[in-house]
A protein has these predicted regions:
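ATP-dependent helicase/translocase motor core
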Residues: 2-258
Length: 258
């Protein structure tokens, strides 16, 4: 769903509570459960005091990945409430908004495109003209993650993108240094490298798979996969299921380790 141009919309957030509430209700949850889920999500995504962006982002990821544990009423057994239907991608509400104005302290910023799943901002894309390098978009994303800009908005963001029509799409996660933003290299029928990579990485099932299966939090650093690591893992998984052996052939610097 296209949510529109949110440049002048008030109250833009990384959790659009009305959308999330409606989706949770469509999954059969009552108002009491939904309010408790929203309260937990709001608490865990907050940055402040000893809680840094990495900590809040990891806490939100745990809620996304493993569900929110909610006790409906006193004395009742806890239930796991899922914020995302990982098994059935089409059962989720996917939406994008452009020019999303986010109020910061003291500076306000406006990400080009935000990808929402069930009302939760999970991806952000900075797009540049072909005459402006993708690195400019990467640095813009990194600046936006600073405390003086809109750091709080990135507490739910799982994948960070930047690109242009000539260089294609680069991807990383929160805190990824500019030099580690990677180009997604996959053959396809679309000639334009930016359109091709966005279509490949942001396809519903692929987007959720990358978040669910290809993100790690390693000693204070959040990481995601390169293209070859993604396809190598899928091939290895298929062989393991079929009880077949094999060799994954790597070259120096190809990402054998995290």
């Amino acid at each position: 769903e296209y949510l529109g141009d949110w440049q002048d919309r008030e109250g833009n957030s990384n959790v659009e509570e009305e959308i999330l509430s409606n989706w949770l209700a469509s999954q059969g949850h009552n108002a009491t459960i939904i309010n408790k889920v929203l309260t937990k999500l709001d608490k865990d995504k907050a940055i402040g005091g000893a809680t840094q962006l990495y900590d809040a982002n990891r806490a939100v990821y745990d809620l996304l990945r493993y569900g929110v544990k909610v006790q409906p009423e006193a004395g009742e057994q806890k239930q796991t409430i899922w914020l995302v239907d990982w098994k059935n991608p089409e059962n989720n509400h996917f939406a994008v908004a452009e020019e999303v104005t986010i109020l910061g302290k003291p500076h306000t910023k406006r990400p080009d495109i935000v990808i929402y799943v069930n009302g939760i901002a999970l991806g952000v894309i900075e797009l540049k003209r072909s005459t402006v390098t993708a690195s400019h978009g990467i640095r813009q994303n990194l600046d936006n993650q600073k405390k003086e800009f809109i750091q709080h908005f990135f507490s739910t963001i799982q994948l960070v993108f930047a690109g242009n029509d000539t260089e294609g799409l680069r991807h990383g996660v929160i805190g990824t240094p500019e030099r580690f933003f990677l180009q997604w290299k996959e053959d396809g029928d679309i000639d334009n490298p930016l359109d091709r990579s966005i279509t490949q990485m942001c396809e519903k099932s692929r987007f959720l798979e990358l978040i669910h299966d290809f993100i790690v939090f390693d000693a204070g650093i959040k990481k995601t996969c390169r293209t070859n690591q993604y396809f190598g893992t899928l091939a290895t998984r298929e062989r393991a299921v079929n009880r077949e052996g094999g060799i994954v052939w790597h070259t120096q610097g190809s990402g054998k380790s995290l």
